[in-house]
Curated annotation (Swiss-Prot):
Belongs to the class-V pyridoxal-phosphate-dependent aminotransferase family. NifS/IscS subfamily. InterPro entries: Aminotrans_V_dom, Aminotrans_V_PyrdxlP_BS, Cys_deSase_IscS, Cysteine_dSase, PyrdxlP-dep_Trfase, PyrdxlP-dep_Trfase_major, PyrdxlP-dep_Trfase_small. Master enzyme that delivers sulfur to a number of partners involved in Fe-S cluster assembly, tRNA modification or cofactor biosynthesis. Catalyzes the removal of elemental sulfur atoms from cysteine to produce alanine. Functions as a sulfur delivery protein for Fe-S cluster synthesis onto IscU, an Fe-S scaffold assembly protein, as well as other S acceptor proteins. Transmembrane segments: none annotated. GO terms for biological process: [2Fe-2S] cluster assembly. GO terms for cellular component: L-cysteine desulfurase complex. Its cofactor is pyridoxal 5'-phosphate. Gene3D superfamilies: Aspartate Aminotransferase, domain 1 (3.90.1150.10), Type I PLP-dependent aspartate aminotransferase-like (Major domain) (3.40.640.10). Keywords: 2Fe-2S, Cytoplasm, Iron, Iron-sulfur, Metal-binding, Pyridoxal phosphate, Transferase. It comes from the Bacteria. The lineage of its organism: Bacteria, Pseudomonadati, Pseudomonadota, Gammaproteobacteria, Enterobacterales. It comes from Photorhabdus laumondii subsp. laumondii (strain DSM 15139 / CIP 105565 / TT01) (Photorhabdus luminescens subsp. laumondii). This is Cysteine desulfurase IscS. Pathway: Cofactor biosynthesis; iron-sulfur cluster biosynthesis.
Amino acid sequence: MKLPIYLDYSATTPVDPRVAEKMMNYLTRDGIFGNPASRSHRFGWQAEEAVDIARNQIADLVGADPREIVFTSGATESDNLAIKGAANFYQKKGKHIITSKTEHKAVLDTCRQLEREGFEVTYLAPQSNGLIDLNDLEAAVRDDTILISIMHVNNEIGVVQDIAAIGEMCRSRGIVFHVDATQSVGKLPIDLTKLKVDLMSFSAHKIYGPMGIGALYVRRKPRIRIEAQQHGGGHERGMRSGTLPVHQIVGMGEAYRIAKQEMESESQRLRGLRLRLWQGIKDIEEVFLNGDLEHGAPHILNVSFNYVEGESLMMSLKDLAVSSGSACTSASLEPSYVLRALGMNDELAHSSIRFSLGRFTTEEEIDYAIELIHKSIGRLRELSPLWEMFRQGVDLNSIEWSHH
């Protein structure tokens, strides 16, 4: 077993060696290096064929038509293109958008930008387990609502939203429905022939593909229109201009192919490992599970350790690569906005750690992590005056703290 142990698979994943090997054939003179838009010679044709194969591999995993897959630079761009693209195209019908407070920053910040441009956005608060109440969603819909954006799996707590039910509601009311599936694709089954989802964002680097490549699913029947956000050459059927990075696209395709093949067995394995981790730490005093194990994605476990500061816990767990919150926001010392939206107080939100498991996580690593967490929590609480006061039965909320 090598230290440190990587338990931050929701931030990014290592590229699978099978993916890296395939990508290497699309970079140098010895391989296929042409521009897929070069239609006049073999170099371009071979590159175009490689892109077509990858497009099919991605479509196969999610039950889409390959013509519905638009390549982007990643899920952040896909979210931007979906939300701004649909809002701009359908704004004559209305200017109201609905999303949730626990979305990824790529969705929230895009909605904030649209507010500056004159759109109105309703941000729904989830229930304490992280799930959106469908009655709340229905109640928020107005005559001028044109777009609803709800993520499939939350990147911090792993809760799985009922996108099938939300999709039915949107379709019956003629509202465009966007889903950010970055954390669910390749881990949970997605079948877009059955789901009433109009736009769906994907990434490669969360399922053992390369960084810097993603895709947006844009439904053809009933046809959904979006306005391009990037111009210059009309690539990707006019929705996203720019030379296609063949090696990255091939990597994404191969990663999605492997995910389809291994998803069922791997999801079961990860569920088992996550349960082993939770069983190993749940008896520590004042430990709380954030999210919902029943409705949770198989790879994420978010836990709060009361009376322990999250940053100091991460320092003392230096042999475990874990995060507090998501990578996009964990550089700040603000408590997680996702946990705050679940109604959690700052102290508990500050003491939360996200463990995310993946393809290369072993039982041995989980057992080592359990032992290390027990030791670290014990040591940090010995140093904590708050813990001592709590043990003595002092109600910490009743104390008047003096501010310096």
